């Protein structure tokens, strides 16, 4: 319809219209081709730029791939290590689980034992409470008895004090009796100066001084026979004395010496811490009353 209208409007022939349309169309096509070529050139430039970008991206991608591959290898190694560690930890976890199970069982057993012990202790506490109640009564009784005992002790102390006085009096009496018995025993042994007895000893020295002391003989005493003597029976400061008669010049050797008779004494005798020469002294030995 458009072609007919165009022929009619232009008052021309079909061929003229076609020629005109062809020329117009060719120009239009050429113009379009030129535009397309221009677009193609621009797109080629864009493609060249994109190719460079692609090349750059490919190089970068290859580098990144190498880096990623290296990282993957390292990660693979780390994963292997982690796998081993995880396996070991899994074993440890299993062991820990077993231990926890055992601990749980032990805890249950301990709780059972604790509960049993607690029940036993409760019973013991109740028993002890009853015992304490009984003991309170017993303590009251004991307290009363203690007071009675304390009162008895006071009485006993008084009686003991009286007994001490009596015992001391008896001891004094016994000591006096022993002294009298000793004196009687001395009298009973005879008139002789004997060993193992302590006598009174009067020493009248040639210079006129007189000393009163005691004398103990370690053997029976005979005239003209040396005998070991000392002031006491301790055995310290001993010396040898010889006794002779003042009334006769005859030999009285081996004759026992009488008590209470004056004698001539020769030798040394202790005087305190010193040994004194009493040779030529007139002496008397008699019983200690």
Swiss-Prot record:
This is Uncharacterized ORF3 protein. The lineage of its organism: Viruses, Riboviria, Orthornavirae, Pisuviricota, Pisoniviricetes.
């Amino acid at each position: 319809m458009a072609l007919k209208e165009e022929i009619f409007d232009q008052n021309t022939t079909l061929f003229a219209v076609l020629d005109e349309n062809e020329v117009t169309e060719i120009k239009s096509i050429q113009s379009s081709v030129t535009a397309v070529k221009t677009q193609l050139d621009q797109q080629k430039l864009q493609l060249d730029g994109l190719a460079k970008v692609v090349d750059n991206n490919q190089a970068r991608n290859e580098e990144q791939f190498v880096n990623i591959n290296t990282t993957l290898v390292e990660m693979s190694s780390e994963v292997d290590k982690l796998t081993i560690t995880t396996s070991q930890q899994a074993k440890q976890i299993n062991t820990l689980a077993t231990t926890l199970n055992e601990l749980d069982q032990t805890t249950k057993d301990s709780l059972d034992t604790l509960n049993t012990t607690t029940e036993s202790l409760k019973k013991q506490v109740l028993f002890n409470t009853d015992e304490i109640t009984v003991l309170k009564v017993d303590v009251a009784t004991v307290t009363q008895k203690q007071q009675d005992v304390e009162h008895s002790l006071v009485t006993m102390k008084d009686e003991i004090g009286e007994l001490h006085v009596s015992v001391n009096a008896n001891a004094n009496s016994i000591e006096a009796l022993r002294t009298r018995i000793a004196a009687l025993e001395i009298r009973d042994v005879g008139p002789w100066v004997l060993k193992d007895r302590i006598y009174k000893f009067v020493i009248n020295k040639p210079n006129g001084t007189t000393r009163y002391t005691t004398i103990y003989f370690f053997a029976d005493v005979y005239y003209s026979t040396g005998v070991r003597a000392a002031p006491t029976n301790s055995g310290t400061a001993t010396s040898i004395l010889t006794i002779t008669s003042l009334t006769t010049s005859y030999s009285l050797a081996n004759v026992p010496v009488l008590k209470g008779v004056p004698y001539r004494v020769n030798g040394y005798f202790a005087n305190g811490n010193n040994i004194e020469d009493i040779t030529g002294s007139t002496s008397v030995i008699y019983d200690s009353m």
